[in-house]
Design a protein with these regions (language model features):
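N-terminal amphipathic/basic-hydrophobic helices that include classical n-h-c signal peptides
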Residues: 1-27
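Non-heme di-metal
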Residues: 31-300
Length: 300
């Protein structure tokens, strides 16, 4: 069992490293360079630095800018990329914490494996409003169509990926805005090149922990009829329910398990947490600028 797990871990590291080196060769080591931690922060819920970053994210001006359907369309046309790349983080955890190769062997930590598999189950094949199995990405795309948001750029990006283009090239050819491209590439860099500690921390602090508060902030401040955004409202409420009640606490426990109280791993988790939150702030700021530019053009 130990030999098998070590072999699987080695293959995963080799695969991730190879992908990262290949991406760096394509990009000139710019977009796909590993995020640098500007300062170490203490990995505790009460830490001032981490709480300050989280507060900056949750008080972002973007939530107050999504006040009409056109602004919501701009938001969704960017946010769909975050909905998509979420699965790369989740799949990275699944590869590391469960057995995804043949022959199958039991995972070392069944509780962690169960948590990750539940995430995958919900994200890849949750039940829609109509009771049909559907991925959360598909639900989000349906919600975009309901509010009149364009899926053209995202659809083209996925088409290019499916037809063999590398991520960097697909982002460029699909004309994905830079702030979105940087968010996606940082997520994929962590997913494919990060350690299990980095991925688990990025997953918790960049996704599971802030999502309920972010989505609540959006819902509480928008000025659009719920009837016109029925599918989006259902999607947001579903994530608030799952991430707030189940996935968030489980992701916190998972991170504690993989760090094991070891100082080096805690520092690694700290750095990943900081980078994850800052990446989201940068994405929000880019979307806010797009909305402001739209309003400026409309006023002329």
């Amino acid at each position: 069992m130990r030999l098998f797990n070590e072999r699987v871990a080695a293959n995963l590291i080799q695969s991730r490293t190879g992908l990262r080196h290949h991406m760096n060769a394509i990009t000139g080591n710019n977009l796909f360079s590993k995020p640098r931690c500007e300062s170490d922060i203490i990995f505790t819920a009460s830490n001032g630095d981490l709480e300050c970053l989280k507060e900056k994210l949750l008080s972002h001006d973007l939530y107050g800018a999504v006040v009409n359907v056109r602004a919501l369309q701009v938001f969704m046309e960017a946010h769909v990329f975050a909905v998509w790349d979420f699965m790369s983080l989740a799949k990275s955890l699944q590869i590391a914490l469960t057995c995804t190769q043949l022959p199958w062997f039991p995972p070392e930590d069944a509780s962690s494996a169960r948590f990750v598999n539940e995430i995958i189950l919900n994200e890849e094949s949750d039940l829609s409003q109509e009771g049909q199995a559907q991925s959360h990405l598909e639900m989000y795309l349906d919600a975009m169509k309901e509010v009149g948001a364009s899926t053209a750029v995202f659809d083209n990006f996925l088409f290019l990926l499916k037809n063999g283009k590398e991520v960097e090239e697909a982002l460029n050819l699909a004309n994905v805005p830079e702030h979105i491209a940087r968010f996606v590439t940082e997520t994929l860099n962590i997913s494919m090149g990060g350690s299990i500690v980095e991925v688990a921390s990025y997953f918790l602090y960049g996704r599971e922990d802030p999502i309920p508060d972010m989505f609540n902030a959006l819902i509480n401040r928008w000025d659009v009829s719920d009837l016109s955004v029925n599918k989006l409202r259902w999607y947001l409420d579903r994530h608030i329910e799952l991430d707030g009640d189940e996935h968030g606490p489980a992701a916190q426990k998972l991170l504690q398990q993989v760090t094991r109280g070891e100082p080096d791993k805690i520092r690694l988790a700290n750095c990943a947490a900081q980078n994850a939150i800052q990446a989201r702030i940068n994405l929000w700021s880019g979307i806010l600028q797009d909305i402001a530019a739209l309003e400026s053009t409309s006023a002329q």
